[in-house]
Swiss-Prot record:
Pfam families: MutS_I, MutS_II, MutS_III, MutS_IV, MutS_V
One GO process term, biological-process aspect: mismatch repair
Functional summary from the UniProt entry: Component of the post-replicative DNA mismatch repair system (MMR). Forms the heterodimer MutS beta (MSH2-MSH3 heterodimer) which binds to DNA mismatches thereby initiating DNA repair. MutS beta recognizes single base mismatches and trinucleotide insertion-deletion loops (IDL) in the DNA.
Region ranges (Disordered): 1-77
Main subcellular location of this protein, as a coarse class: nucleus
Binding site for ATP: 817-824
Protein name, UniProt field: DNA mismatch repair protein MSH3
PANTHER family linked to this entry: DNA MISMATCH REPAIR PROTEIN MSH3, DNA MISMATCH REPAIR PROTEIN MUTS FAMILY MEMBER
GO molecular function: ATP binding; ATP-dependent DNA damage sensor activity; damaged DNA binding; mismatched DNA binding
Length: 1081
């Protein structure tokens, strides 16, 4: 048939000609079968033959329509009739069409059924070479992806090409939606030979994606770019449940303490990390806030019903700025109402499924026991934690990831006795992981300490920084490892490292056996590999591709073989430590885990079952290496395909004989194989199928070839199904090695963290901290300490300070001084150095001797929390209340300007009472910054335990007697003594407050200070407040002194307003002295 000429633009948009006047027969219309939906993606020779026969029997080319027929004359009254009908609707009442009365196409019917099963999922339905959205999903896709949505039959629809699936899934997931991918579950070849050959393709939900499950799902990173990924950040799914508890009451009838008990389970599905905790929490939910801030979840699962305050806090945390996804689950979903029974039942099902599919694993489990979640472990968990665990099980079951919770070795409690949990306030106010300017990592303590080379090392270091150690032996072990690596660095440079690495086949060999060279080469090689921690978890979930599997196993094998050259074994005795390459106990333990023969041998064994060349060229059907005892069904399917292909290839001989062409060969064009190409004038049998042609040749498929290709396509599809089942079985067998591989990757991450801390200690003038025994008094002794973050900015211009706090001596410092003098920087510096030391890092000081702290608590800055319904002062006192309840005698407490959010009298009283409680009841180490001089009087009640300090400065008076017009030079050095001036007007000038406002403020300050001075003098003399009349000679002399001082200030003052205030006050004093003639001078 000839190709019809494309219409012009004007003809394309012209109204169509009217249909014939006769009405169609309704009976005939109903009897016609539904339209056939063709969404085939593979070649079907039999279908091509049927199409060819149909075209051959078709009528010849139809004559062209006349121009008048194709482009009718426009009706001038058409627009007028449209407006009349639009503005004057029919008086008949409009009855909307119900869903039951609609006539759906077969594809739409499938979509309706799928949407009824998954109402909360945005579905991407595979239709041919595109993924289509329907209804509301199409509108969401149009808004998020920026694509066009239009009406098609009964639904709005939009689509994206199949090769861009990965990119668009990530964008939709990142926008907070749950995405379901619906794929065709049959191919054209299988469909053409099945009972459904005339119906639509069968489709089913093949994958679900959310923010917490995306990285653990099938590899969809292709084509998305780095900016769309989630990088090295954790993607925790956190489930929260709570229940009411009876609040404690104070004697005055005010409720206090805790009102709920909270259970939390957090799962990092992409790494297999599972954390849990149960604790009492107060009305402000400060404990829950600390957990949420520490885990930084990507998704929250709320167990309903939740208390109103918990729900309010979590919803506010997952606001638009945080981009955290929220999903709710009812606790009524348990079949028998018992969460414990539900978890045990799920674990038994998973265990039975694992062991049933793998006989070797069953024997191994019987011999030594699997590392899994046992009934004993579940029964020992707190009640609410089990509820949260059951909800998490049920939630992950829809994604197929519930098996990760079965790995009991991954579980750890957040309230470990060996780790310190920093509160949400401490993490935020000390800028431990994020800065307070833009919320990024730049400028934080973690960013300053992070010199890791791998993403999983960076994740582990983040955990170390937010959870410092509380065990002196563990801290010393880390410091020993850091010291040894730092000493080994010596004069080695990165250029020497690269020259000492040579290639030996597919492996890297190390010329020098020195430990640092081995460690650096391994970490450098791992930095160039993929995220193997998430890789082994995807393998465990059976979502990894063959290329990723090979890359992960090769990385683990490379690391293990290189570190094996150090000759360190797990059962080595201490007697060989003197001659050993590595002496640190922690380093030897980590090295032995990575280079374990079990890990290396299993990695090699798994790689030997795969065809790397086939994986590189993308031949998925030839990836698995078959043998007599391995994948027998796959071997049979491959053999069947090979036999059919050989039969087809051998049939060329018969065609040579039939056509009398000796050199006839099959031709392959555009992926179509076994073509017979003949000249245009050649005569061929009538049943030969014409496939394509050129000017001089025509290419055919004889009936034998058509039948053979059909048989080959069917055998190939069967091979693909068997291959997928064999690959899934191969991945399932990985479960028995998962624990060993996970431990090896975790050890690699720990080595990377220790190497990072060693780099930090060498790049800057850091010192190893010393820790006193636990039985000794708590102390902090830092000489020439420096702020670890500000020092990187100021370099040599930073001014160091000493800090000495001792439980049996001075354990509280009250710090005063001018604004912008460095008070907050100093107290932050002490806290950050303490945290760094307990992380196991060297610290920025010339000497550091500390006691292991069980907590670092801070109350700094002024901020409200409107979304949580908290004012600035409530937020301030809530943080102080949390500190008072939580701290102990082994804690470091930092309070910065407590009480400034209310009136002066209330603020001073609250600050004084809080500090007195900490000193008398808790006896913890305290750094207290204040602008209230009255607070310093507390040192009288605690002689020798409280010291007053201020940040030093120099002043230069412009004019003698001037008030607050001094030039101030900040020295940033902490010295003993109380500072009574804050130089607030200097800060006002720096902030560019209008000069008129500053002058007026100075005038008011002078007046207020004069009144306060008079009030204090009257108080000393025993006069009632407000009575300023001098009595007796001494009072008159004092009044004259004030008179002359005011006159002196007025004469030297440049500002007329200020001078006037001094003169006015002097006039009042003179008037009072004049009215007392009995006074003798």
């Amino acid at each position: 048939m000839g190709k019809q000429k494309q219409q012009t633009i004007s003809r394309f948009f012209a109204p169509k000609p009217k249909s014939p006047t006769h009405e169609p027969n309704p009976v005939a219309e109903s009897s016609t079968p539904p339209p056939k939906i063709s969404a085939t993606v593979s070649f079907s020779p039999s279908k091509r033959k049927l199409l060819s026969d149909h075209l051959a029997a078709a009528s010849p080319k139809k004559p062209k329509l006349s121009p008048h027929t194709q482009n009718p004359v426009p009706d001038p009254n058409l627009h007028q009739r449209f407006l009349q009908r639009f503005l004057e609707p029919s008086p008949e009442e409009y009855v909307p069409e119900t869903s039951s009365s609609r006539k759906y196409t077969p594809l739409e019917q499938q979509v309706v059924e799928l949407k009824s099963k998954y109402p909360d999922v945005v579905l991407m339905v595979e239709v041919g070479y595109r993924y289509r959205f329907f209804g509301e999903d199409a509108e969401i896709a149009a808004r998020v992806l920026g694509i066009y949505a239009h009406m098609d039959h009964n639904f709005m629809t939009a689509s994206v090409p199949t090769f861009r699936l990965n990119f668009h899934v990530r964008r939709l997931v990142n926008a907070g939606y749950k995405i379901g991918v619906v794929k065709q579950t049959e191919t054209a070849a299988i469909k053409s030979h099945g009972a459904n050959r005339t119906g639509p393709f069968f489709r089913g939900l093949s994958a679900l994606y959310t923010k917490a499950t995306l990285e653990a799902a099938e590899d969809i990173s292709g084509g998305c770019g780095g900016e769309e990924g989630f990088g090295s950040q954790s993607n925790f799914l956190v489930c929260v449940v709570d229940e009411r508890v009876k609040s404690e009451t104070l004697g005055c009838g005010i409720e206090m303490s805790f009102d709920v008990r909270v259970g939390v389970v957090g799962v990092e599905i992409s790494t297999g990390e599972v954390v849990y905790e149960e604790f009492n929490d107060n009305f402000m939910r400060s404990g829950l806030e600390a957990v949420i801030l520490s885990l930084s979840p990507a998704e929250l699962l709320l167990g309903q019903p939740l208390s109103q305050q918990t729900e309010k806090f979590l919803v506010a945390h997952a606001g638009p700025t945080s981009n955290v996804r929220v999903e709710r689950a009812s606790l009524d979903c348990f079949s028998n109402g018992n969460a414990v029974d539900e978890v045990i039942s799920l674990c038994e099902k998973i265990s039975a499924g694992n062991l049933e599919d793998d006989k070797e694993m069953k024997l191994e489990a019987a011999e030594k026991g699997m590392s899994c979640l046992t009934v004993h472990t579940i029964m020992n968990m707190p009640h609410l934690t089990v509820q949260a665990l059951a909800l998490t099980f049920c939630h992950l079951k829809q994604f197929g990831f519930e098996r990760i919770l079965y790995q009991g070795a991954s579980f750890r409690s957040l309230s470990s006795n060996t780790e310190m949990t920093l509160s949400a306030n401490t993490l935020q106010q000390l800028e431990v992981v994020k800065n307070n300017s833009d919320g990024s990592e730049s400028g934080s303590l973690f960013h300053n300490m992070n010199h890791t080379l791998t993403v999983y090392g960076s994740r582990l270091l983040r955990h170390w920084v937010t959870h410092p150690l509380c065990d002196r032996n563990l801290i010393s072990a880390r410091l020993d490892a850091v010291s040894e690596i730092s000493a080994c660095m010596g004069s080695h440079s990165s250029s020497q490292l690269s020259s000492e690495l040579v290639e030996e086949g597919s492996e890297r060999a190390i010329v020098s056996p020195e430990f640092y060279l081995v460690l650096s080469s391994v970490l450098t090689a791992m930095s160039r590999s993929s995220d193997i921690q998430r890789g082994i978890t995807r393998i465990f979930h059976r979502t990894a591709k063959a290329t990723e599997f090979i890359a992960v196993m090769e990385a683990i094998l490379l690391a293990g073989k290189q570190i094996q050259r150090l000759g360190i074994k797990q059962d080595s005795e201490m007697r060989s430590m003197q001659s050993a390459t590595v002496r640190s106990t922690l380093l030897r333990k980590l090295i032995s885990v990575i280079s374990s023969p079990v890990v290396v041998d299993n990695a090699g064994k798994l790689l030997s079952a795969l065809n790397k060349e086939a994986a590189v060229r993308g031949d998925l059907l030839d990836i698995l290496i078959t043998s007599s005892d391995q994948f027998p069904e796959l071997a049979e399917a491959r053999q069947a395909v090979l036999v059919i292909r050989e039969k087809l290839d051998s049939s060329i001989a018969s065609f040579r004989k039939k056509l009398a062409i000796r050199n006839l060969e099959f031709l392959q064009v555009s992926g179509i194989t076994h073509l017979i190409e003949l000249p245009v004038d050649s005569k061929v049998p009538m049943n030969w199928v014409k496939v394509n042609s050129t000017k001089k040749t025509i290419r055919y498929h004889p009936p034998e070839i058509v039948a053979g290709l059909d048989e080959l396509a069917l055998a190939t599809e069967h091979l693909a199904i068997v291959n997928r089942a064999s690959w899934d079985s191969f991945l399932k067998s990985f479960s028995r090695y998962y624990t060993d591989f996970k431990a090896a990757v975790q050890a690699l991450a720990a080595l990377d963290c220790l190497h990072s801390l060693s780099t930090l200690s060498r790049n800057k003038n850091y010192v190893r901290p010393e820790f006193v025994d636990d039985c000794e008094p708590v102390e902090i002794n830092i000489q020439s300490g420096r702020h670890p973050v500000l020092e990187t900015i100021l370099q040599d211009n930073f001014v160091p300070n000493d800090t000495i706090l001792h439980a049996e001596g001075e354990y509280c410092q009250i710090i005063t001084g001018p604004n912008m003098g460095g008070k907050s920087c100093y107290i932050r510096q002490v806290a950050l150095i303490s945290i760094m030391a307990q992380v196991g890092s060297f610290v920025p000081a010339s000497f550091a001797k500390l006691h292991v702290l069980d907590g670092v608590f801070t109350r700094m800055g002024a901020s409200d929390s409107i979304q949580h319904g908290r004012s600035t002062f409530l937020e301030e006192l809530s943080e102080a209340s949390h500190i008072i309840r939580t701290c102990s005698s082994r804690s470091l407490v930092i309070l910065d300007e407590l009480g400034r959010g209310t009136s002066t009298h209330d603020g001073v009283a609250i600050a004084y009472a809080t500090l007195q409680h900490l000193l008398a009841e808790k006896r913890c180490l305290v750094l207290f910054v204040t602008h209230y001089p009255e607070i310093a009087e507390i040192s009288n009640g605690f002689p020798g335990s409280v010291g007053t300090y201020h940040v030093s400065y120099l002043t230069l008076q412009k004019d003698k007697g001037s008030y607050d017009h001094d030039d101030v030079t900040y020295l940033y050095k902490l010295v003993r003594g109380l500072c009574s001036r804050s130089f607030g007007f200097k800060v006002a000038q720096l902030a560019q407050i209008p000069p008129s406002c500053i002058r007026r403020a100075i005038s008011m300050a002078a007046k207020l200070e004069a009144e306060v001075r008079a009030r204090e003098r009257n108080t000393r003399m025993g006069e009632p407040e407000g009575h300023e009349e001098p009595r007796g000679a001494e009072e008159s002399i004092s009044a004259l002194g004030d008179l002359f001082a005011d006159l002196k200030f007025a004469l030297s003052e440049e500002d007329p307003w200020k001078a006037f205030e001094f003169l006015k006050h002097a006039w009042k004093i003179a008037g009072k002295i004049r009215l007392k003639p009995t006074c003798s001078f």
